[in-house]
Amino acid sequence: MKLIILTGLVLFAIVSLIEAEEESGRACILLYGECTKASGSCCSNLICDCYRKLKKGVQIARQCFCLEKDVVYKKHI
C-alpha cells in the first residue's frame, strides 16, 4: 500500500515539474508584437492593446499589439 502511494506522489511531482517547466519556457511577445490571438503573452512591462479596423464605419478586423503601459498613442492627420 505504501509503495502505491509513494509511486503516485512521485508521478504527481514529475508531472507538476514538467508543467512548470513548460510555462516558464514560453517566450513573451516583445514591444509592437502582435498579440491578437494571445492577449496574455506580452512581456511583463507591456500590455496587449486592441484596435478595431473599420471600413465605411463597419468593423472588418481587430488587431492587438503589445504596447508600453500608461502610454497614449495619438493619430496625427
From Swiss-Prot:
Residues 21-26 form a propeptide. Contains 4 disulfide bonds. It is found in: Secreted. GO terms for molecular function: toxin activity. Its main location: secreted. The keyword rRNA processing does not apply. It comes from Lycosa singoriensis. Residues 1-20 form the signal peptide. It comes from the Eukaryota. GO terms for cellular component: extracellular region. Expressed by the venom gland. This is U11-lycotoxin-Ls1a.
